[in-house]
Amino acid sequence: MTGAGNGLGAAFAEALAAKGSAVVVNNRRHADRPFTPDEVVRRIADAGGTAMTDGNAVDAPGAAERIVASAIDRWGRLDVLVLNAGISGPAVKVGAGDTQLEQVLAINLTANHRLVEAALPHLRRSPAGRIVFVSSTGGLHGVRGRSAYAASKGALNAYALSLAAELRRDAIGVNVLAPYAATKMTAQPGQEPDPLLAPEGAAETCAWLASVECDRSGEIWVAGAGHVRAARALESATMRFSPDALSALAAMPEPRGYQGGEAAFADFYQDITGE
């Protein structure tokens, strides 16, 4: 469980531990503040669960291999990868250069890819390999003032859905969780967090997606306050191009969802050829 020192990650770690998982509680160390995973592990232990800490920053060189090794060295196996670590980053303005965008992508996308690569050999040996990518509806709809963050989460969604298709034969379940929660990352200055959106309200969905009982894969789930909804990309019916056609299709008549870009193209081709 990456990014599990507080907020959503801590709630997810505790929920999985309550279901019987032994959890690696990962979070980067900060020299100027306490190492919060220690407290998360203590709460898990007090509740009768099993957990250990890991202080690797997910974007550091070799971190993926070290994080995975923490689980293997301690328990000899790895069944679940929950990729929660991420940053919102500053607002990226046109003309500001690439540095801020690259930083957000390095943590929100590239680090997750590296962890998947490091974990896959072990997940393939597991009787119930599961990967849960923690994303955001910003990756589906965009976020005004946070274009880099939205781009990173949109890329993460596409990566996860593609990976789900690639790993279907390995029986590894891959899903995306887009939680709504009031955390330090989402809080506005001087604003009290909404108790309805406590991180625990999305934790049950995370624990289910990570469980052996979950037989779903290749899907995006939005969760918060103990509720859940499905999300997916949709395309409308097909019409010959004209400005009027764009106006008509913007209302999304006959919306269609697809399992992969290949299926979307095949359906489009059938519409234009009648075959």
Segments and roles (model prediction):
Residues D79, I87, G97-H113, V132, ...:
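Catalytic Tyr-X3-Lys loop
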Residues V116, S152:
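Active-site helix of classical SDR
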Residues S136:
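Residue(s) in the substrate-gating loop at a strand-loop-helix junction
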Residues M1-V24:
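Canonical Rossmann dinucleotide-binding motif of NAD(H)/NADP(H)-dependent dehydrogenases/reductases
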Residues R66-D73, V92-G95, T99-A106:
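Active-site Tyr-X3-Lys motif and surrounding loop/helix of classical short-chain dehydrogenase/reductase
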Residues S21-P37:
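Conserved glycine-rich Rossmann-like NAD(P)H-binding loop of the short-chain dehydrogenase/reductase
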Residues F35, A57, G86-E102, G145-A148:
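Conserved mid-core segment of classical short-chain dehydrogenase/reductases
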Residues V176, D194-E275:
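C-terminal helical subdomain
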